[in-house]
């Protein structure tokens, strides 16, 4: 949700909390821009799983929710997998493998990079790349909702997917 607010340059579009796990349902945002390839599209905020402080019963419902959502969307242009810069979890690896198994090659965005020291950044990006078994040419986008770092690269990735759709 923080990333969506940052990406769209809006403070309170998506609800954000200090405690991870605020997003507990599929939230749909209709976006309009002046870009001819991205004139109107939807951004979907799905529940995260990593550090969410929610009951196990709630967390157990997220897998089927994500699965049914992602499997039922033929018009889906781009999947963005957010990975916390502090650690790549087993769930991150499983999600990446599952996305590949259903035909999606997600853009991986490493969040909270503003918390990393300069010497940790390169190592963290390499670890994410290796931990998720990413192909050599696939980039990892470092992102900070606080500073806006990575915003232009992520917009570029979304636009690239829209341009390919239009060809």
Task: Name every feature range the model reports, one short phrase each.
Residues 1-53, 163-165:
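Conserved G1/Walker A P-loop phosphate-binding module
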Residues 29, 111, 154:
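Residue-level signal for inorganic ion chemistry
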Residues 7-11, 70, 132, 158:
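Hydrophobic aliphatic residues
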Residues 22, 48-50, 85-88, 113-117, ...:
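Conserved nucleotide-binding/hydrolysis micro-motifs of P-loop NTPases
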Residues 43-45, 80-81, 141-144:
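Extended hydrophobic secondary-structure segments that form protein cores and membrane-embedded regions
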Residues 115-167:
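Canonical P-loop GTPase G-domain recognition
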Residues 38, 61-138:
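Conserved C-terminal guanine-recognition region of P-loop GTPase G domains, centered on the G4
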Residues 57-59:
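Long, positively charged low-complexity segments
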């Amino acid at each position: 949700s923080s990333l969506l607010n940052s990406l769209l340059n809006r403070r309170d579009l998506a609800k954000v909390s200090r405690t991870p796990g605020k997003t507990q349902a599929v939230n749909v945002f209709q976006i309009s821009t002046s870009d001819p390839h991205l004139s109107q599209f939807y951004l979907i905020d799905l529940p995260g799983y990593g550090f969410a402080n929610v009951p196990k019963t709630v967390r157990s419902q997220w897998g089927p929710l994500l699965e049914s959502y992602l499997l039922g969307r033929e018009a889906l242009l781009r999947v963005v997998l957010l990975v916390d810069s502090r650690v790549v979890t087993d769930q991150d690896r499983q999600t990446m493998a599952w996305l590949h198994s259903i035909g999606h090659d997600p853009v991986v965005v490493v969040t909270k990079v503003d918390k990393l020291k300069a010497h940790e950044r390169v190592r963290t990006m390499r670890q994410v790349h290796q931990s998720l078994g990413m192909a050599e040419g696939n980039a990892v986008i470092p992102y900070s909702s606080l500073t806006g770092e990575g915003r232009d690269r992520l917009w570029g990735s979304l636009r690239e997917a829209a341009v390919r759709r239009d060809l």
